[in-house]
Structure formats: structure tokens, C-alpha cells
């Protein structure tokens, strides 16, 4: 399924285009106009009711992970939080909790106004949660007082564990999956913070460093470019390498999103497996980490090259993908041994589908963290604009399910070797998952 970004919030769809934003480059012409605007109470109520009606009518299974009574209670509670002094940003925060409660990673409500916030309202450092502890990855303009690796204990007086729990309640994900939220909370932290703290004009943190706890008021950021890691090294999303010494090939696929460009993806896969066969490579690593999905035809084409028997991809025929309901034969040039497949919480949508079929048919060995997707998800999403506030509400409209139906829909694919890097390895940019996999190969 294809990656789709509504401003800066990653949701995914089968047939929408990938959009890019330059919001990481903060400028002085940003404004609070719109996000702090107060609409008439009746306008909020009308938009809220419009969103709920669309959610319940368009979504194929809004009660899959929450009972009808529980969802109705939440809807009523959130509706009652709306007052005549609620800002548009506050209304968005209220609405997000309802949409996130159905546990569908392809459904979200968002606003382009968040992309226009002044830098004073955006948390000015790159951070990452490891479990429930929050660490600085890049202090940006605060490097004179803070360092990467310092642990943040509170932000504007709120414990970071409480903050994480609140943000999780407003982040969409599939089922009861938290690995996907754990990854995305770092990506969207500054926007979630802005909403949670009701768009503050400054941030003060208490930080543990050098054995002491300090309270520090943060400087604004000039830019908020994400912290680069080894996972960003595959610039074109498709990379291949052979290590002849260990007789190991590594195929890196950061996206399946080759809609209308399937020949590019197929040529890459054909080339990889041709070289593997020509060089008589016995060990294969397929790195799918941070692959948030894309075209199901791409997922199936990769699967053909590691399958050892015919398979059917989709459980039911799906518009535009009816061929994937038919029996698909393994590729004669495919890999004959079991590959090692590297996964994490950002493996979503089509990547979850691919992994589910590998798991169901025992075609590979998974290493890393639970995937963000599984054998089923909801997609064919459509954007709707709320009448008064102009918030964008994106709702999934169809169930997309592979034939790996013995798996649970509540969680992602669980790795055979569960491995999550600790803060030291993250700070040192050490690829512990790949290194662990290479050691496994050496022991064989």
C-alpha cells in the first residue's frame, strides 16, 4: 500500500501520491493564525458530528478493537469537552483521540495549520523514547547546555511518561500495536507537544545529566531537520550489497511505493537475485526496516523470489489487485534458503502484508522489533474536509487482508529474534540488528 503524507502526519493508502513538506526548515513568517482561532461552538459541534458520521459510515470495521459502547462513551466525553473557548488546535486534539481509538493506522484527522506554527511553539530538540524514557538525540540551539544522550524527565512540568501516554492516545496505529507508535512519537513529537501543551510559547525541561538534575529553559530552534541514522544510508530506497567473505547478500528495501514504476522495482529485484545466483550466495538478509508500505504488486514480486511453493496473496479479490487473489508461482530464479528479514515498528501496511505471508508460510527468519502492520489493515482511504474548521479527515474504507489469516490482527509480526537497541547503541549509530544477524550467520 502506498505511502501518503497529510502535511507531516504519515498515513498510508493504496492509491494516493507521496507529498513532501519543508516544515523542518522553520522561518520567521510562521503564524498561529488558524490554529488558535476560536470558532463558534455550534461550528465545532457540527464538524465533530460530521467526522463521527463519516467514521461510522465509511470505515469498514470501527468496532474491531473497541466495543460500540466504549466508542460511544468516548465520543460523548470528547464532544462534551468542546466549549465556546476551544481553539481550533484544541478541537483537533479532542478529535484525534476519537479517530485514534478505533486503532486503524490508515485513518487520521489533521490540519495544514500545524505546518505554519512559529518556531516558539515547536519543541526545539530532536528526541527519542526508549521504552518510557525520553532522551535527547540532538540539542540543536541548546548545545551549550545540553548534550545528546541527556535524559529528559519533565517538559513544562509534565512527567515524560505521562506525556508519552497522552501522545499514544492520539497516534493512530493498527490493532493494539505500540511499536509503530514508539517509532512515530519521535517523528511527530514537536507537533504532538504543541497540541498537548495548548501551543505554548516556550519550553522548560528538567534534565538528568552528569548525575544531577537541572531545570533549563530551551532556546528556539533554527531548524528541526531529523537526526540521520544508518537507516537513512540507502538514498534511493533500493540497495544491494554482497559480502563474498561471509557469502552473504543484503537487499535493502525502504519502500514498496513504486506505483506506475513497477518496472524499476522488478528490475532491481531481478538484478539482485541474478547476482545472488551467479555468485552462489548461501545467505540472504532482506532489510525492511522503516518500510512503511507501498504497492502490493511489489510486495508480492519480492515474495515470489523467496517462496518455495505457490501462494495466494490476498484473501479476497480487491479492486485493482485482482491478480493477487489468483495462485502465484515462485520465481525460478528465487533464493532457495531461508532469508533473514530485518524489521521494526515502521514496517507498515504492505510491508506488514508481506511479512505476514512470510511468517505464515515459514519462509524467513525475522530479527528486530514487532512490525507496525500485520496480515490485515483497512485502506482505500479518502480525504474529507470538515465543513467549518477545514480539518482534513482521512478515513479508510475497505479491509485489505492477506491469506495469512491464522495470525492475530491485534499485533504486528513478532520477530524470531527480538532485539531493540539501547540508548548507547542509538547514540553511537550502531546497527545492532544487522550486526546480530551477521553473527548468527557466522555461527552456522
Indicate where each model-derived feature is located.
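Positively charged n-region of N-terminal signal peptides that target proteins for export
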Residues: 1-4, 18-20
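Sec-dependent N-terminal signal peptides
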Residues: 4-13
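Flexible, low-complexity junctional segments that flank or bridge functional domains
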Residues: 18-283, 290-292, 297, 312-314, ...
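Active-site-proximal beta-strand/loop segments in catalytic clefts of secreted hydrolases
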Residues: 139, 252-256, 287-291, 317-318, ...
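Gly/Ser/Thr-rich loop/hinge elements
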Residues: 293-338, 342, 346, 376, ...
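Extended C-terminal subregions enriched in glycine
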Residues: 338-360, 365-373
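C-terminal soluble interaction/assembly domains
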Residues: 359, 366-386, 395, 402
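Low-complexity, Gly/Ser/Thr/Pro-rich intrinsically disordered linker/tail segments
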Residues: 409, 413-444
Amino acid at each position: 500500500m502506498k505511502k501518503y503524507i497529510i502535511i507531516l502526519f504519515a498515513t498510508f493508502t493504496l492509491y494516493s501520491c507521496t507529498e513532501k513538506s519543508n516544515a523542518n526548515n522553520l522561518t520567521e513568517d510562521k503564524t498561529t493564525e488558524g490554529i488558535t482561532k476560536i470558532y463558534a461552538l455550534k461550528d465545532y459541534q457540527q464538524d465533530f458530528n460530521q467526522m463521527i458520521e463519516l467514521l461510522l459510515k465509511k470505515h469498514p470495521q470501527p468496532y474491531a478493537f473497541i466495543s460500540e459502547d466504549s466508542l460511544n462513551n468516548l465520543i460523548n466525553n470528547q464532544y462534551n469537552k468542546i466549549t465556546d473557548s476551544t481553539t481550533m488546535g484544541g478541537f483537533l486534539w479532542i478529535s484525534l483521540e476519537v479517530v485514534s481509538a478505533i486503532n486503524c493506522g490508515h485513518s487520521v484527522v489533521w490540519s495544514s495549520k500545524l505546518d505554519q506554527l512559529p518556531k516558539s511553539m515547536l519543541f526545539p530538540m530532536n528526541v527519542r523514547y526508549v521504552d518510557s524514557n525520553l532522551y535527547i538525540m540532538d540539542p540543536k540551539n541548546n548545545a551549550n547546555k545540553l548534550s545528546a544522550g541527556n535524559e529528559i524527565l519533565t517538559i513544562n512540568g509534565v512527567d515524560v511518561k505521562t506525556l508519552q501516554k497522552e501522545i499514544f492516545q492520539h497516534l493512530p496505529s493498527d490493532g493494539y500495536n505500540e511499536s509503530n507508535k514508539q517509532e512515530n512519537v519521535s517523528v511527530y513529537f514537536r507537533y504532538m507537544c504543541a497540541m498537548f501543551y495548548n501551543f505554548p510559547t516556550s519550553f522548560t525541561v528538567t534534565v538528568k545529566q552528569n548525575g544531577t538534575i537541572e531545570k533549563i529553559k530551551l532556546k528556539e530552534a533554527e531548524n528541526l531537520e531529523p537526526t540521520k541514522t544508518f537507516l537513512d544510508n540507502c538514498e534511493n530506497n533500493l540497495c544491494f550489497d554482497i559480502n563474498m567473505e561471509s557469502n552473504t547478500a543484503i537487499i535493502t528495501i525502504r519502500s514498496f511505493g513504486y506505483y506506475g514504476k513497477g518496472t524499476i522495482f522488478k528490475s532491481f529485484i531481478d538484478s539482485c537475485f541474478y547476482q545472488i545466483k551467479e555468485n552462489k550466495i548461501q545467505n540472504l538478509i532482506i532489510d525492511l526496516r522503516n518500510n512503511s508500505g507501498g504497492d502490493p504488486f511489489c510486495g508480492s514480486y519480492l515474495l515470489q523470489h523467496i517462496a518455495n511453493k505457490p501462494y495466494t496473496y490476498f484473501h479476497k479479490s480487491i479492486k485493482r489487485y485482482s491478480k493477487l487473489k489468483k495462485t502465484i508461482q515462485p520465481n525460478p530464479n528465487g533464493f532457495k534458503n531461508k532469508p533473514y528479514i530485518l524489521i521494526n515498528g515502521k514496517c507498515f501496511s504492505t510491508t506488514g502484508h508481506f511479512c505476514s505471508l512470510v511468517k505464515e508460510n515459514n519462509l524467513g527468519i525475522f530479527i528486530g522489533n514487532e512490525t507496525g502492520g500485520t496480515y490485515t489493515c483497512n485502506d482505500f482511504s479518502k480525504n474529507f474536509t470538515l465543513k467549518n474548521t477545514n480539518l482534513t479527515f482521512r478515513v479508510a474504507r475497505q479491509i485489505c487482508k492477506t491469506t495469512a489469516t491464522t495470525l492475530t490482527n491485534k499485533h504486528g509480526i513478532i520477530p524470531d529474534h527480538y532485539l531493540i537497541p539501547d540508548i548507547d547503541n542509538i547514540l553511537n549509530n550502531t546497527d545492532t540488528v544487522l550486526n546480530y544477524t551477521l553473527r548468527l550467520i557466522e555461527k552456522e
